[in-house]
Amino acid sequence: MEQKVRSHLSRRLIKRRKELDLINQKLLTLLNQRLRITLEIGKVKKEMGKKIHDTEREKEILDRLKRKNRGPLKEEDLRKIFMTIMKVCRQSQI
């Protein structure tokens, strides 16, 4: 591969990686924001004597996300990601 093409590809790669770094930072911020809110919800649930795990609510969340998903994220991958997020948030409420 000639040097000019390689240099162009390298710049594209660096640019895309920087974009991913920004997205990752935004995701981290949003995940921490979500966790703070779920901690508050957990306190309210305890005060009300409610269970932490609400399978119906989780199903509603997943169904809504599936309807809104336009891809390329596959439905099963979306489910796995959000099940993990919800599990981590749920465990933090205990």
Please describe what each predicted stretch is.
Residues 1-94:
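Domain-level signature for soluble enzymes in the chorismate/prephenate branch of the shikimate pathway
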